[in-house]
Regions:
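Flexible, glycine-rich loop/tail regions that form catalytic "lids" or insertion modules at the edges
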Residues: 1-443
Length: 443
């Protein structure tokens, strides 16, 4: 298997670009990209509002909501599997440990309802969740009666609308965009069954979501949830096409995020509803990570925190001066790297996450890179092929902020026509190669 590798030097001295042995154009000069604090970039919306907003919620409120969304009416006959699901969620909220992705989502939506913000969630399988993670609508196994706990919250000041939609992405996206653009107080969410299927609604994404404000002054808080991740499911169930959304991102027209924990997702949804400047939000959501212990959060993290544009390596605090390679990544690949057997041995490697892909958190990333005084290289790691994912955009953004003597490298799959392998053994081999390469410096 040929490795995909690219290397550039900082300080304006580009080295040859190598990808599967093929030369490519030199990196753009630093002058072509906006500097930190560049007034023009901020005016164009290229730099998101650094005031992250107060998105934390009190423990008492979260626990009270948790009690309500894990309860069923007296005499309701829930299936034993669903009852176990509710009991596990109730225990997580009571103990404050193990808050998973779907629980974070439910708590975010419920707290918005209490604040008076309508929440509307539609998609091809949103009631249950494509991966059986949500279970917002319960069915009495004896009578067939439906019950949605989230629609019966005490002190709710706005309705929660929940709709399993037809298998027509373009029709649903068009309707939901129209709804969102006409009601600024609503958080309108459309979820694809798999992120790959969003391409069936590409006309709405291109003509309205990405450019509606530029053409007609139409703004919205329209939110897309696109399940994404290379987990061996094949080319039609692996990629939400991060590269396509990033290619549409300009002039601050949208927000694009790839959160890696339940708490980050919780704060991201609340921020989207509360932030003063409405923009569409594209979220690349997980599949296997929905139940991954490493991606869970504590209830405390939902109270006194906010959405972080980037997450530095928490394990590097005591060994910052030893770090010579800084790995930058986004989404689920972080957990593959952080959970690998080689992680503990790589003392000179730090692994940081870019949670907000657009607008680019230029100032924060630049400060983080500068804080590693003995850095030799920065590596962008992704599981997507090099002509897909975030690499093309990240390369352009990152090269201009490399300190003197620090190189910018790429590790991931080489250029491909198809998003992923169709053979599980080949997938596992590639994932292992990427993770091992990320933790093995070239010096």
């Amino acid at each position: 298997m040929r490795p995909a590798h690219a290397k550039f030097k900082g300080a304006g001295s580009p080295a040859p670009f190598l990808l599967a042995g093929r030369p490519a154009p030199s990196p753009i000069p630093r002058a072509a990209a906006a500097r930190p604090g560049d007034a023009r970039a901020r005016a164009a919306g290229e730099i998101d509002d650094p005031r992250r907003g107060d998105t934390g919620v009190s423990l008492d409120t979260l626990r009270e909501i948790g009690k309500q969304i894990t309860s069923v009416p007296e005499g309701f006959n829930a299936h034993k599997t669903i009852q176990r699901f509710l009991d596990n969620r109730k225990k997580a909220i009571e103990t404050g440990q193990g808050i998973d992705w779907a629980t974070g989502e439910a708590l975010a939506c419920c707290t918005l309802l209490k604040d008076g913000h309508r929440v509307r969630l539609s998609g091809q399988d949103v009631e249950r969740g494509t991966f059986s993670q949500r279970h917002l609508v319960l069915h009495d196994e004896k009578t067939g009666i439906k019950y949605a706990p989230i629609q019966h919250l005490e002190e709710s000041k706005a309705p929660f609308e929940l709709h399993n939609s037809p298998l027509s992405e373009i029709a649903c996206l068009g309707f939901e965009y129209g709804y969102a653009s006409s009601d600024d107080n609503s958080l309108v969410i459309w979820e694809a069954q798999f992120g790959d299927f969003a391409n069936s609604g590409q006309v709405i994404i291109d003509s309205f979501l990405a450019s509606g404000e530029s053409k007609w002054g139409l703004t919205s808080r329209m939110t897309l949830l696109l399940p994404h991740g290379h987990e061996g499911a094949g080319p039609e169930h692996s990629s939400a096409r991060i590269e396509r959304f990033l290619s549409l991102a300009a002039e601050g027209n949208m927000r694009i995020a790839n959160p890696s924990t339940a708490a980050q997702y919780f704060h991201l949804l609340r921020r989207q509803a509360l932030i003063k400047k409405p923009r569409p939000l594209v979220v690349f959501t997980p599949k296997g990570m929905l139940r991954q212990p490493a991606a869970t959060s504590t209830l405390e993290q939902l109270t006194d925190s906010h959405f972080h544009f980037i997450l530095d390596d928490p394990s590097a605090t005591e060994r910052r001066d030893k770090v010579e390679r800084l790995v930058l990544c986004s989404g689920r690949i972080y957990h593959d790297i952080d959970g690998s057997d080689q992680r503990a041995e790589a003392e000179n490697v730090a692994v940081a996450r870019i949670e907000l892909l657009y607008p680019f958190a230029r100032d924060q990333i630049s400060e983080m890179i500068a804080s590693y005084k003995n850095l030799k290289e920065v590596v962008w790691v992704q599981e997507e092929p090099s002509n897909m994912g975030a690499w093309s955009v990240m390369r352009r953004r990152l090269i201009e902020m490399m300190p003197d003597g620090v190189t910018l490298d790429y590790i991931g799959r080489p250029e491909r026509a198809s998003p992923s392998e169709g053979y599980s053994v080949a997938h596992v081999q590639e994932q292992q190669r990427i993770v091992l390469s990320a933790l093995t410096p070239n010096f």
